[in-house]
């Protein structure tokens, strides 16, 4: 019996060595998801950050048989593998957030951000 595939939207963001870290994250997401599609990447100014470096942001839509909880754990593991730490110095090597799992939206504040509203149109 085939497992149910769930449609997901994941946001990618980085404010440190942005292009390299985003490329690493994309490679990992291509391995993780079935039919991964990526938007273009856009630069944004930091919001509520102690650092002034711009963020590179991108969205990804794909499908997975993983449950929601397991998918979130795997995303956090990918962040660690790329070099993310949870210190408070404002460096975000990579941030992978599950914005939507099937029809359930997460990170509701992010849905109001201009870059999400712009990039979601590319999916």
Regions found by a protein language model. Give the residues of each.
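Short, surface-exposed acidic-centric catalytic microdomains
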Residues: 23-65
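Flexible, gly/pro- and Lys/Arg-enriched active-site loops
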Residues: 47-56, 66-73, 77-123
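Short N-terminal binding/cap micro-motifs at the start of the first secondary-structure element
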Residues: 17-21
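Extreme N-terminal starter segment of soluble prokaryotic enzymes
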Residues: 4-9
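Active-site nucleotide/adenylate-binding loops and adjacent lid/helix of ATP-dependent enzymes
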Residues: 11-13
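Short, surface-exposed acidic/glycine-rich loop or hinge patches that mediate macromolecular interfaces
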Residues: 15-16, 65
């Amino acid at each position: 019996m085939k497992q149910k595939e769930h449609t997901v939207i994941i946001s990618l963001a980085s404010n440190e060595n942005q292009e390299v870290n985003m490329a690493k994250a994309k490679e990992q997401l291509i391995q993780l998801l079935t039919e991964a599609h990526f938007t273009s990447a856009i630069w944004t100014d930091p919001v509520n950050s102690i650092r002034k470096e711009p963020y590179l942001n991108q969205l990804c839509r794909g499908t997975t048989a993983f449950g929601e909880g397991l998918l979130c754990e795997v995303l956090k593991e990918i962040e660690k593998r790329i070099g993310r730490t949870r210190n408070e110095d404002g460096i975000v090597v990579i941030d992978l957030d599950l914005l939507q799992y099937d029809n359930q939206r997460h990170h509701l504040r992010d849905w109001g951000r201009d870059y999400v509203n712009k990039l979601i149109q590319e999916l």
